[in-house]
């Protein structure tokens, strides 16, 4: 480990790593010296992120995966465990927005898909990687949330409820693992950020009026390197 590569020798895994906050966070972790496992559905998009990391002198491995498939997550956990002795950083970023609609009009099938990706997949990731996280000298789990998870907003019921449940799940995990002194949980609200999801939610918004994903990625890295407490929810403003 060196000052310019504080995560040298560490292993990180980022979900939703093909674009936006996930891609930016993966690149920031790699720039800090970590070997980053890139997880998302689209292999070609992951390869683009992998190429940028390699061109910058970093290390990355792609793992194309549909996170809505619990068995696939378990297999990924087994594959990573077979190759690496420990996991130092797990970033749970993948999510879907779904339709912004009144509660009474929420489509049950879409809501089920949304809860599967935004909540159940994250529990499955923790289940698959908890043993490997506990083998690290110090491990960090970062979960991306949203202000609507704790501040209800009209038409955001489906997405907001998934994030509210995620915050409870991760807060519970933080409480359950605090005794170890080796595993920290960070619940991160990125705030308004220039992503495809944001553009879909606010189509009339000027993209340059909100911060780029890189700002969020740098804040996440800074938190990982700091003496931050476990279970804390933080909001990242520009």
Tell what function each PLM region has.
Residues 183, 187-188, 195, 203-238:
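C-terminal helical subdomain
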Residues 74, 97-112, 155:
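Conserved mid-core segment of classical short-chain dehydrogenase/reductases
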Residues 44, 64-75, 108:
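The beta1-alpha1 cofactor-binding region of Rossmann-like NAD(H)/NADP(H)-dependent oxidoreductases
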Residues 96, 134-179, 192:
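Catalytic loop of short-chain dehydrogenase/reductase
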Residues 11, 18-20:
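Conserved glycine-rich cofactor-binding loop
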Residues 78, 117-137, 175:
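Amphipathic alpha-helical dimer-interface segment in Rossmann-like NAD(P)H-dependent oxidoreductases
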Residues 104-123, 142, 166:
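Catalytic Tyr-X3-Lys loop
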Residues 32-48:
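Conserved glycine-rich Rossmann-like NAD(P)H-binding loop of the short-chain dehydrogenase/reductase
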């Amino acid at each position: 480990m060196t000052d310019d590569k504080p995560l040298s020798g560490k292993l990180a895994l980022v979900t939703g790593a093909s674009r936006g906050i996930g891609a930016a966070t993966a690149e920031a972790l790699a720039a800090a010296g970590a070997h980053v496992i890139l997880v998302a559905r689209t292999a070609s998009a992951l390869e683009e992120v992998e190429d940028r990391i390699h061109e910058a002198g970093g290390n990355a491995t792609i793992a194309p995966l549909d996170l809505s498939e619990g068995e696939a997550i378990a297999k990924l956990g087994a594959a990573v465990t077979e190759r690496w002795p420990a996991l130092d950083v797990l970033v749970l970023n993948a999510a879907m927005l779904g339709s912004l609609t009144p509660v009474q009009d929420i489509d049950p099938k879409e809501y089920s898909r949304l809860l599967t990706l935004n909540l159940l997949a994250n529990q499955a990731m923790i289940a698959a990687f908890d043993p490997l996280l506990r083998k690290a000298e110090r491990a960090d789990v970062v979960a991306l949330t949203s202000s609507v998870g704790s501040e209800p907003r009209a038409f955001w019921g489906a997405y907001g409820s998934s994030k509210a449940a995620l915050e409870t799940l991760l807060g519970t995990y933080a409480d359950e693992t605090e005794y170890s002194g080796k595993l920290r949980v960070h619940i991160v609200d990125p705030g308004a950020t220039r992503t495809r999801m944001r553009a879909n939610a606010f189509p009339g918004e000027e993209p340059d009026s909100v911060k780029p994903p890189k700002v969020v990625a740098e804040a996440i890295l800074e938190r990982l390197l700091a003496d931050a407490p476990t279970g804390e929810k933080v909001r990242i403003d520009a």
